[in-house]
């Protein structure tokens, strides 16, 4: 058993969904040819003066409001000085010392336990470019398309103690920024990534240990695995009586290890000073109130409402509110056919499975809530069985068809004629005398076998309840 407690703080970088960069009008479009979305400001040319993107300020304030921060009406930008090949100015424009949003929090519920994670600050900054390494040519290339893209950095307090808590915190943050519409949160494109600071200390100690930082973690799985490895690594060092080195490390997902990158910098190393080319940011109380009024219902409160208003299980509500678009889809379907539990099951079992199969998001889905609502209705009307619903869903999904028309056109309506069902049941029992004898001798689980055989003969179109009833009636004679 470990004698140490992990202390974790996360710095989450969220790319804001503005069309232009933070200090110029260059587009932020992902995937364009290298060095096409750049200008003199992106490239750090002498004399090129930045001009602040006001929408980025609005998005940062909305994030601060959603995370219960104090919104500072007066903040300013500083230059964070360090050398890196893809940082053309030789400094990053940030708000490390005088942030727009400070002193917030995020409440989590993890395995029925509530925990509050403090937010130290949220500040605006511009992203760096990208280094592209070509081992075959023994060269490195610089793409400045990303240079100047607007970010907010959400800095937590060191209130996180386990990798699972860290992942829960990140998932909740991800839901918030996507619900707000300030970022698409695309982790594969680097639009939501984090650096993790971690140290160990003896249980019940208030003293913080020497920390290491793990850079650029871009998936929830990588955060979990990297923190688990680093906790074990530091624990082994401390138990051997050795000292933790304060350093920056990288996580290698292929080898599932962290490796040293460089010594860990401190604020003094960056020589922060106010940027002389940018005026301070002034935000009025009226602007703050306006933006506050535009914040939608967020995932946490929506999840609670789904449980109370629609009677859903907590787990189902959590799944359905995992994205704003999915929650909207569910509610639109329920308004059309007010059977929330049935709608929820169809979305969970059929729609989400199909999205995974096609590797697309709900935003890319062409199926309409009307189709799910109608599918639920015709199942309840006994027009089709659940099995038929499963069988036809691929076509409904891929071809944007309405269920009732499809079922009638293809002759797939459920058979509820008792005489027809009785006839097929008698045939099935006659074909399986050994199983019938075993059933009558107490092997009642064979009922499922008989149901399956009847459904097979009737191509899945028989009413399952009537098949069950017919089997019971005939077998009891």
UniProtKB/Swiss-Prot annotation:
GO terms for molecular function: asparaginyl-tRNA synthase (glutamine-hydrolyzing) activity; ATP binding; glutaminyl-tRNA synthase (glutamine-hydrolyzing) activity. Keywords: ATP-binding, Ligase, Nucleotide-binding, Protein biosynthesis. The keyword Iron does not apply. It comes from the Bacteria. It catalyses: L-glutamyl-tRNA(Gln) + L-glutamine + ATP + H2O = L-glutaminyl-tRNA(Gln) + L-glutamate + ADP + phosphate + H(+); L-aspartyl-tRNA(Asn) + L-glutamine + ATP + H2O = L-asparaginyl-tRNA(Asn) + L-glutamate + ADP + phosphate + 2 H(+). Pfam families: GatB_N, GatB_Yqey. Signal peptide: none annotated. One of its GO terms (biological process) is glutaminyl-tRNAGln biosynthesis via transamidation. Its EC number is 6.3.5.-. Belongs to the GatB/GatE family. GatB subfamily. Heterotrimer of A, B and C subunits. Allows the formation of correctly charged Asn-tRNA(Asn) or Gln-tRNA(Gln) through the transamidation of misacylated Asp-tRNA(Asn) or Glu-tRNA(Gln) in organisms which lack either or both of asparaginyl-tRNA or glutaminyl-tRNA synthetases. The reaction takes place in the presence of glutamine and ATP through an activated phospho-Asp-tRNA(Asn) or phospho-Glu-tRNA(Gln). This is Aspartyl/glutamyl-tRNA(Asn/Gln) amidotransferase subunit B. The lineage of its organism: Bacteria, Pseudomonadati, Thermodesulfobacteriota, Desulfovibrionia, Desulfovibrionales.
């Amino acid at each position: 058993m470990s004698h140490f407690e992990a202390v974790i703080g996360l710095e989450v970088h969220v790319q804001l969904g503005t069309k232009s960069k933070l200090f110029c009008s260059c587009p932020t479009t992902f995937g364009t040819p290298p060095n096409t979305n750049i200008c003199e400001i992106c490239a750090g040319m002498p004399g090129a003066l930045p001009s602040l993107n006001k929408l980025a300020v609005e998005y940062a304030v909305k994030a601060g409001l959603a995370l219960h921060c104090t919104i500072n009406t007066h903040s300013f930008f500083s230059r964070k000085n360090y050398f890196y090949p893809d940082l053309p100015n030789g400094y990053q424009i940030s708000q490390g010392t005088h942030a727009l949003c400070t002193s917030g929090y995020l409440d989590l519920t993890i395995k029925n336990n509530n925990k509050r994670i403090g937010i130290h600050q949220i500040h605006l900054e511009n992203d760096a470019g990208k280094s592209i390494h070509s081992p075959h040519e023994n060269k490195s290339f610089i793409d400045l398309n990303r240079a100047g893209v607007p970010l907010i950095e959400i800095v937590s307090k060191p209130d996180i103690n386990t990798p699972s808590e860290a992942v829960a915190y990140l998932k909740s943050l991800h839901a918030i920024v996507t619900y707000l519409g300030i970022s698409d949160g695309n982790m594969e494109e680097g639009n939501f990534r984090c650096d993790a600071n971690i140290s160990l200390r003896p249980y019940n100690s208030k003293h913080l240990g020497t920390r290491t930082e793990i850079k650029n973690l871009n998936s929830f799985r990588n955060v979990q695995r990297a923190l688990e490895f680093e906790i074990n690594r530091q624990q082994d060092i401390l138990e051997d009586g050795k000292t933790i080195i304060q350093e920056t490390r990288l996580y290698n997902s292929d080898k599932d290890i962290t490796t040293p990158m460089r010594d860990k910098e401190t604020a003094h190393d960056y020589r922060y000073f106010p940027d002389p080319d940018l005026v301070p940011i002034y935000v009025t109380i009226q602007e703050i109130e306006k933006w506050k009024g535009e914040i939608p219902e967020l995932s946490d409160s929506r999840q609670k409402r789904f449980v109370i208003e629609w009677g859903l299980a907590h787990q189902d509500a959590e799944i359905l509110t995992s994205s704003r678009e999915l929650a909207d889809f569910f509610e639109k379907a329920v308004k059309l056919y007010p059977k929330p539990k049935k709608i929820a099951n169809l979305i969970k079992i059929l729609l989400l499975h199909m999205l995974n199969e096609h590797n697309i998001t709900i935003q890319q889905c062409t199926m309409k809530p009307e189709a799910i609502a109608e599918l639920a209705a015709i199942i309840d009307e006994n027009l089709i069985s659940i099995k038929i619903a499963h069988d036809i869903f691929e076509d409904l999904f891929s071809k944007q068809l309405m269920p009732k028309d499809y079922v009638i056109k293809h002759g797939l309506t459920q058979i509820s004629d008792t005489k027809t069902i009785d006839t097929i049941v008698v045939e099935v029992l006659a074909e399986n005398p050994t199983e019938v004898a075993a059933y009558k001798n107490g092997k009642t689980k064979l009922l499922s076998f008989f149901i399956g055989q009847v459904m097979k003969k009737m191509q899945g179109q028989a009413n399952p309840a009537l098949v069950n009833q017919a089997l019971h009636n005939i077998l009891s004679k």
